[in-house]
Amino acid sequence: MGVLEIAKGMGLTLGKLFQKPVTVSYPEERATLKPRFRGRHVLTRHPGTGLEKCIGCSLCAAACPAYAIYVEAGENDPHDPVSPGERYAKVYEINMLRCIFCGMCEEACPTGAVVLGNEFEMADYRYNDIIYGKEDMLVGVEGSRAQRRDAANAGKPVRVGFRVDGGARDELEGVTYPQ
């Protein structure tokens, strides 16, 4: 009985040896993403006017089960509007470490301003860089966040480190950390 089971196992191994490998040599090769893939959040603009679609209603923040979104609304100036309507998102922040990419914010948005895109490379060196602000997410800003940062830091040495205290955020002190 033991010899038969060993022969079956060896046969299975030999059969798998000649099959095409499933792995992808990332980053040289890119895997094709599924149409329903949920990646980095994007805030969109109206195509004709260029105004932001976000009206600062905070429905995305209310729908977020991970409490990753913070929205602070501001009154729109009628002479220089930021978005159509009376209000706009003065502050829009999303903590990508808390986000679970469920898409509830996208579904809750009444104007279609929040869209989960296809970008999935969001690693960074510092905690504060993982909290995306409105300027990091608006479509129409040249290049991605990482490309703009790399262009600004071209030729500068990069210092990589870690926090000894674990990097826990203190609610009373806010999100600013010493470098």
From Swiss-Prot:
Q: Where in the cell is it found?
A: Cell membrane
Q: Gene3D superfamilies, from UniProt?
A: 3.30.70.3270
- EC class, as a word, reads translocase
**Which amino acid positions bind [4Fe-4S] cluster 1, per UniProt?**
C54, C57, C60, C109
Its required cofactor(s), as named, are: [4Fe-4S] cluster
The molecular function GO annotations come to: 4 iron, 4 sulfur cluster binding; iron ion binding; NADH:ubiquinone reductase (non-electrogenic) activity; quinone binding
Main location (coarse class): membrane
Write out the catalysed reaction.
Answer: a quinone + NADH + 5 H(+)(in) = a quinol + NAD(+) + 4 H(+)(out)
Please, one GO biological process term?
aerobic respiration
Tell me a GO cellular component: plasma membrane
Outline the extent of the 4Fe-4S ferredoxin-type domain. Answer: 45-74, 90-119
Which controlled-vocabulary keywords does the entry list?
4Fe-4S, Cell membrane, Iron, Iron-sulfur, Membrane, Metal-binding, NAD, Quinone, Repeat, Translocase, Ubiquinone
Supply the InterPro entries for this chain.
4Fe4S_Fe-S-bd, 4Fe4S_Fe_S_CS, NADH_quinone_OxRdtase_chainI
Which function does this protein serve? NDH-1 shuttles electrons from NADH, via FMN and iron-sulfur (Fe-S) centers, to quinones in the respiratory chain. The immediate electron acceptor for the enzyme in this species is believed to be ubiquinone. Couples the redox reaction to proton translocation (for every two electrons transferred, four hydrogen ions are translocated across the cytoplasmic membrane), and thus conserves the redox energy in a proton gradient.
Q: How does it assemble?
A: NDH-1 is composed of 15 different subunits. Subunits NuoA, H, J, K, L, M, N constitute the membrane sector of the complex.
Q: Which HAMAP family match?
A: NDH1_NuoI
Q: Name it.
A: NADH-quinone oxidoreductase subunit I
Source organism per entry reads: Deinococcus deserti (strain DSM 17065 / CIP 109153 / LMG 22923 / VCD115)
